[in-house]
Amino acid sequence: MTKITKEEVNKVAHLARLELNENEINNHAEQLEKILDYIRQLEKIDTDDVPCTTRAIEVVNVFRKDEKKNSDCNEELLELGPSREDKYFKVPKILNE
């Protein structure tokens, strides 16, 4: 059984544009290892006699026909937000460049 290393957690965090401290790195390594252990358990289950399926239950008539509706409440909706610029919501920057 291979353990998740701190370097692997850092690599995934970097790809996800996350900055993790040492405690978070250790926690994520433990959590990822638990997930992989669970997957290893699932891989051992014999599913040869289980039919293939795409859903747990059959779903029928889940779509409705699209309807075009006029929306004249843009100004009212923008007033509900904490901040706006012209006709758009203004949100804080969350990504570093």
From Swiss-Prot:
Name the EC number(s): 6.3.5.-
Q: Which GO terms describe its biological process?
A: glutaminyl-tRNAGln biosynthesis via transamidation; regulation of translational fidelity; translation
Q: Show the stretches that span the lipid bilayer.
A: none
Question: Does Ribonucleoprotein appear among the keywords?
Answer: no
Q: Write out the catalysed reaction.
A: L-glutamyl-tRNA(Gln) + L-glutamine + ATP + H2O = L-glutaminyl-tRNA(Gln) + L-glutamate + ADP + phosphate + H(+); L-aspartyl-tRNA(Asn) + L-glutamine + ATP + H2O = L-asparaginyl-tRNA(Asn) + L-glutamate + ADP + phosphate + 2 H(+)
Q: Which controlled-vocabulary keywords does the entry list?
A: ATP-binding, Ligase, Nucleotide-binding, Protein biosynthesis
InterPro entries recorded: Asp/Glu-ADT_sf_sub_c, GatC
- Which molecular function term from Gene Ontology is one that the record holds? asparaginyl-tRNA synthase (glutamine-hydrolyzing) activity
Top-level taxon of the source organism: Bacteria
Q: Which NCBIfam families match?
A: gatC
Job of this protein? Allows the formation of correctly charged Asn-tRNA(Asn) or Gln-tRNA(Gln) through the transamidation of misacylated Asp-tRNA(Asn) or Glu-tRNA(Gln) in organisms which lack either or both of asparaginyl-tRNA or glutaminyl-tRNA synthetases. The reaction takes place in the presence of glutamine and ATP through an activated phospho-Asp-tRNA(Asn) or phospho-Glu-tRNA(Gln).
Q: Which family does it belong to?
A: Belongs to the GatC family.
* Subunit-level organization: Heterotrimer of A, B and C subunits.
PANTHER family to which the protein is assigned, alphabetical: GLUTAMYL-TRNA(GLN) AMIDOTRANSFERASE SUBUNIT C, MITOCHONDRIAL (PTHR15004:SF0)
The protein's name is: Aspartyl/glutamyl-tRNA(Asn/Gln) amidotransferase subunit C
Q: What is the lineage of its organism?
A: Bacteria, Bacillati, Cyanobacteriota, Cyanophyceae, Synechococcales
What gene does the UniProt entry assign to this protein? Answer: gatC
